[in-house]
Amino acid sequence: MAIRRILTVDNAADLAVLKQVSKDVPAVDDALRGLMDDMLETMYDAPGIGLAAVQVGELVNVIVMDLAREGEEPAPRYFVNPKITWASEELFEYEEGCLSVPEVYDAVERPAKVKISYLNYQGEAVEEDAEELFAVCIQHEMDHLKGVLFIDHLSRLKRDRAISKVKKARRAA
């Protein structure tokens, strides 16, 4: 396993990759499991609760996630070729952040509940209901696979301020 560099919005080349649409993978094999292991290690190191493959420069429909609270046993989850098959009309607002937009947090409104289908780490087909933080996180990460960042859900002014804040923080570091 290896920690990979997380692409960020303050770097033009990184942003160009982050805005691309990822592709489905044909099968879950050892190479893909290696990528998922690297992604999980990278996410834990950051630290974060979710990471899409595009955030480490891989344009494949893969997400890793761990919603365990501090002090709880780690509970890593893997989502290959995830799809939302149903979304509630009821909305839920949550203050989101993103490892590709460091130190920026803002409220985003999304469907409160979704049904998802995906392949797991072993390549088995899974269908599952998601609500609350799980629903927010899976939708946030699936947006990445479509080239959409959480700041794209904000007004142009807030989005521009967010990118400026990240650039300013990088210069100060």
From Swiss-Prot:
Molecular functions per Gene Ontology: metal ion binding; peptide deformylase activity
Keyword Zinc-finger: no
Enzyme class: hydrolase
Binding site for Fe cation: 98, 140, 144
Reaction catalysed by this enzyme: N-terminal N-formyl-L-methionyl-[peptide] + H2O = N-terminal L-methionyl-[peptide] + formate
One of the GO biological process terms: translation
Origin: domain of life: Bacteria
Keywords, alphabetical: Hydrolase, Iron, Metal-binding, Protein biosynthesis
Cofactor needs: Fe(2+)
Gene3D superfamilies: Peptide deformylase
Residues annotated as catalytic: 141
Protein family (similarity comment): Belongs to the polypeptide deformylase family.
Its biological purpose: Removes the formyl group from the N-terminal Met of newly synthesized proteins. Requires at least a dipeptide for an efficient rate of reaction. N-terminal L-methionine is a prerequisite for activity but the enzyme has broad specificity at other positions.
Name of the protein in its database record: Peptide deformylase
